[in-house]
Amino acid sequence: MMTEEHTDLEARIIKDIHCKEIDLVNRDPKNINEDIVKVDFEDVIAEPEGTYSFDGVWKVSFTTFTVSKYWCYRLLSTLLGVPLALLWGFLFACISFCHIWAVVPCIKSYLIEIQCISHIYSLCIRTFCNPLFAALGQVCSNIKVVLRREG
């Protein structure tokens, strides 16, 4: 009984990222396409004052643009959406793999080696430079500057 409750609790706590629900209403929750892809008729076609087409032409042009953009996007996403999602998933999996298994270990190795070198560098500074600059400080500590105005 206790084991079943523990397993049930673990099942509720651990959520697999592959099973998470997606929002079919807000498909851009992080607003990554806020200003980039939003292109409406008014963003592309505009008639300056004094150079207007017939009202009917303007209305039909608006409808044609909007409907053709809508259905062309739907057709392209139907034909290419899944293959491109597969391609992008593969690409980002490769990038993640390289980052996890190559980049981070290289950086960690570099930091370990640099730490060893930094100890040697610090020792050299304390051994050679600190006494030199302390002596120069003593020599220059008795310098007095007097400013006089002439004239």
Swiss-Prot record:
Main location class: Golgi
InterPro entries, per the entry: Caveolin (IPR001612), Caveolin_CS (IPR018361)
Chain intervals for the UniProt region annotation (Required for interaction with DAG1): 64-114
Compartments, record wording: Golgi apparatus membrane; Cell membrane; Membrane, Caveola; Cell membrane, Sarcolemma
Family, similarity comment: Belongs to the caveolin family.
Function: May act as a scaffolding protein within caveolar membranes. Interacts directly with G-protein alpha subunits and can functionally regulate their activity. May also regulate voltage-gated potassium channels. Plays a role in the sarcolemma repair mechanism of both skeletal muscle and cardiomyocytes that permits rapid resealing of membranes disrupted by mechanical stress. Mediates the recruitment of CAVIN2 and CAVIN3 proteins to the caveolae.
Membrane-embedded but not crossing: residue ranges: 84-104
GO biological process: actin filament organization; calcium ion transport; cardiac muscle cell development; cardiac muscle hypertrophy; caveola assembly; cellular response to ionomycin; cholesterol homeostasis; cytoplasmic microtubule organization
Subunit note: Homooligomer. Interacts with DYSF. Interacts with DLG1 and KCNA5; forms a ternary complex. Interacts with DAG1 (via its C-terminal); the interaction prevents binding of DAG1 with DMD. Interacts with TRIM72. Interacts with MUSK; may regulate MUSK signaling. Interacts with POPDC1. Interacts with CAVIN1, CAVIN2 and CAVIN4.
Pfam families: Caveolin
Effect of residue 27 to Q: Results in aberrent localization of TRIM72 and defects in membrane repair
Entry comment on modification after translation: Sumoylation with SUMO3 by PIAS4 may reduce agonist-induced internalization and desensitization of adrenergic receptor ABRD2.
Position(s), cross-link Glycyl lysine isopeptide (Lys-Gly) (interchain with G-Cter in SUMO3): 38
Gene Ontology cellular-component annotations: caveola; cell surface; dystrophin-associated glycoprotein complex; endoplasmic reticulum; Golgi membrane; intercalated disc; membrane; membrane raft
GO MF, one example: molecular adaptor activity
Protein name in UniProt: Caveolin-3
Tissues showing expression: Expressed predominantly in muscle.
